[in-house]
Amino acid sequence: MTDTRNGEDNGKLLYCSFCGKSQHEVRKLIAGPSVFICDECVDLCNDIIREEVQEAQAESSAHKLPSPKEISGILDQYVIGQERAKKVLAVAVYNHYKRLNQRDKKNDDVELGKSNILLIGPTGSGKTLLAETLARLLNVPFTIADATTLTEAGYVGEDVENIIQKLLQKCDYDVDKAQMGIVYIDEIDKISRKSDNPSITRDVSGEGVQQALLKLIEGTVASVPPQGGRKHPQQEFLQVDTRNILFICGGAFSGLEKVIQNRSTRGGIGFNAEVRSKEEGKKVGESLREVEPDDLVKFGLIPEFVGRLPVLATLDELDEAALIQILTEPKNALTKQYAKLFEMEGVDLEFRTDALKSVARRALERKTGARGLRSILEGVLLDTMYEIPSQSDVSKVVIDESVIDGTSKPLLIYENSEPPAKVAPDA
């Protein structure tokens, strides 16, 4: 609406030429040649421009595919160690999106196939973090599915098509964006066949799920209910082509190392048998590096499913040194996160070296890998984070080994006084 009324100097109200609000309804009214615009309309215009710029930047960055070395370098900023897995993932992801960029070119005789990825590694070794970081780096939709909740269609549980629906939700049901996304299916080892022999009874959460995932991973057109799902059954289903969706499956595969060792150490019997001591046994990570498709079949994955995951990357168990690095070095390291939380209260947080070693040792004892580090720190810092917001004179908190072990409380350093002696926790 264009306002043609006289200005305030003539005793009349001024109105925004865009939304029609008077000068009393808004905080600010900016005058131009015969027009006015309010602060609310300016904010709205800024939001529209910002969204369009972000979309244009995302589109241009999608065309600028980083090289495998650049991908691996960015992964180094967030994931400690696992160099072999990073290299395998970087090459696989680079080739996948290079293939997508090639598909629009006409008169191309060679059709490039899709290479989905299988990550094998102990709990807390960084499988999910690697997949999340890749998706963030490439600016593509990403979703995580839990294989343990999946069942065959018609049974209680989630259908495999629900995975695609989650991916659509991540990109506001933009089918074109979803068709270039990444899906990470966790706990894939939990849907292994319960025995080597085909069972007479139906295995709806094991082999049945593998069969259901086959076509989805290889490439099919999945029918997914739109927003609202069953609430609006009259709506047409969305058709999502999964041929260009990159599937990354991950699992701990506990016991797989024994299958590999049995295969690799198979030898003669009697006098021809090679004698080995228990000390000569390989570590889990070393054994997993020698995995072959047949080992996965013996573990319980069906051959057709293994064939759909041609790229194999194994992750090593994290030792104490790696866990200490994880605590301190990545961009989003846990010690940096907690230091930021304390900084918001105007307090410095310091972790002594012996404290970091103690945290790493406790995580190793729990066999939770890097995933257990946060729960340990959360338990140690809980009381301090509860008290600090109520105390305005604390300038620094120091955590040492005795605090992690539970034999003393964190050392609080006050602004204008000597720090009090540490007090043992109440019995």
From Swiss-Prot:
Residues reported in the UniProt entry to bind Zn(2+): C16, C19, C38, C41
TM stretches of this protein: none
Gene3D superfamilies, A to Z: 1.10.8.60, ClpX chaperone, C4-type zinc finger domain, P-loop containing nucleotide triphosphate hydrolases
InterPro entries: AAA+_ATPase (IPR003593), ATP-dep_Clp_protease_ClpX (IPR050052), ATPase_AAA_core (IPR003959), Clp_ATPase_C (IPR019489), Clp_protease_ATP-bd_su_ClpX (IPR004487), ClpX_bact (IPR046425), P-loop_NTPase (IPR027417), Znf_CppX_C4 (IPR010603)
Domain named ClpX-type ZB: residues: 4-57
UniProt-recorded Gene Ontology molecular function terms: ATP binding; ATP hydrolysis activity; ATP-dependent protein folding chaperone; protein dimerization activity; unfolded protein binding; zinc ion binding
Any GO BP: cell division
Stored Pfam families: AAA_2 (PF07724), ClpB_D2-small (PF10431), zf-C4_ClpX (PF06689)
Listed GO CC annotations: HslUV protease complex
CDD domains in the record: RecA-like_ClpX
Organism superkingdom: Bacteria
Keyword set, alphabetical order: ATP-binding, Chaperone, Metal-binding, Nucleotide-binding, Zinc
Residues bound to ATP: P122, T123, G124, S125, G126, K127, T128, L129
HAMAP family assigned: ClpX
Family matches, as PANTHER family: ATP-DEPENDENT CLP PROTEASE ATP-BINDING SUBUNIT CLPX-LIKE, MITOCHONDRIAL (PTHR48102:SF7), ATP-DEPENDENT CLP PROTEASE ATP-BINDING SUBUNIT CLPX-LIKE, MITOCHONDRIAL-RELATED (PTHR48102)
Similarity comment: family membership: Belongs to the ClpX chaperone family.
Function: ATP-dependent specificity component of the Clp protease. It directs the protease to specific substrates. Can perform chaperone functions in the absence of ClpP.
Subunit structure and binding partners: Component of the ClpX-ClpP complex. Forms a hexameric ring that, in the presence of ATP, binds to fourteen ClpP subunits assembled into a disk-like structure with a central cavity, resembling the structure of eukaryotic proteasomes.
Protein name: ATP-dependent Clp protease ATP-binding subunit ClpX
Organism of provenance: Pseudomonas savastanoi pv. phaseolicola (strain 1448A / Race 6) (Pseudomonas syringae pv. phaseolicola (strain 1448A / Race 6))
